[in-house]
Amino acid sequence: MKLRGLYAITDSQLLAGKFLSYVEAALEGGVTLLQYRDKSSDEARRLREAEALRDLCERYKTQLIINDDAELAARLNVGVHLGQTDGPLSPTRALLGYKAIIGSTCHAQLELAEQAAREGASYVAFGRFFNSNTKPGAPSCSLDLLDEAKRTLHLPICAIGGITLDNAAPLVAHGVDLLAVVHGLFGANSTAEVTRRARAFNELLKV
């Protein structure tokens, strides 16, 4: 499966009161991967929202990814994104099967990406590249890291962290396949603006 394009990530606080309408607006503009990210302990609501997103993604032929919850991903038969505190990737690959999309957070360390690749990751994510509202304390990445990753890794590379339409072009120029965006996509005043931004990100990536 070729993974290239916009990687939209939800934020429950940012999308409060407009969750599904803004997500559908993004899908209308074109989303390669949609990550459901919710750190709350309300499992019933998380299941309800994830099921709604799965149905939307099926309609728009977009792949749904669950953040940090392999069991929920298995229940819905979708992909998962794992952080460095979530343990080794191999058991998750065994749980979800060889076709599932599994991503791995690698911060600013190429070694973590190489390990994730060996364990069966579908893509690796580096970041943050810019100041991030979602993870303000995350270590920062350089464009040089992207160059090195492109030379040594043979799987899609995702960039995350404070990405907007104004700063994304250099990341694409240095070989990024997936632009993971939260506020730069969903921090809009209308659904029409969300759709416009999604299309503009895809134009940058020539998708």
Swiss-Prot record:
Pathway: Cofactor biosynthesis; thiamine diphosphate biosynthesis; thiamine phosphate from 4-amino-2-methyl-5-diphosphomethylpyrimidine and 4-methyl-5-(2-phosphoethyl)-thiazole: step 1/1. It catalyses: 2-[(2R,5Z)-2-carboxy-4-methylthiazol-5(2H)-ylidene]ethyl phosphate + 4-amino-2-methyl-5-(diphosphooxymethyl)pyrimidine + 2 H(+) = thiamine phosphate + CO2 + diphosphate; 2-(2-carboxy-4-methylthiazol-5-yl)ethyl phosphate + 4-amino-2-methyl-5-(diphosphooxymethyl)pyrimidine + 2 H(+) = thiamine phosphate + CO2 + diphosphate; 4-methyl-5-(2-phosphooxyethyl)-thiazole + 4-amino-2-methyl-5-(diphosphooxymethyl)pyrimidine + H(+) = thiamine phosphate + diphosphate. GO terms for biological process: thiamine biosynthetic process; thiamine diphosphate biosynthetic process. Its EC number is 2.5.1.3. 2-[(2R,5Z)-2-carboxy-4-methylthiazol-5(2H)-ylidene]ethyl phosphate binds at residues 132-134, 162. Keywords: Magnesium, Metal-binding, Thiamine biosynthesis, Transferase. GO terms for cellular component: cytoplasm. Mg(2+) binds at residues 68, 86. The keyword Magnesium applies. GO terms for molecular function: magnesium ion binding; thiamine-phosphate diphosphorylase activity. It comes from the Bacteria. The keyword Chloroplast does not apply. NCBIfam families: thiE (TIGR00693). Condenses 4-methyl-5-(beta-hydroxyethyl)thiazole monophosphate (THZ-P) and 2-methyl-4-amino-5-hydroxymethyl pyrimidine pyrophosphate (HMP-PP) to form thiamine monophosphate (TMP). Belongs to the thiamine-phosphate synthase family. This is Thiamine-phosphate synthase.
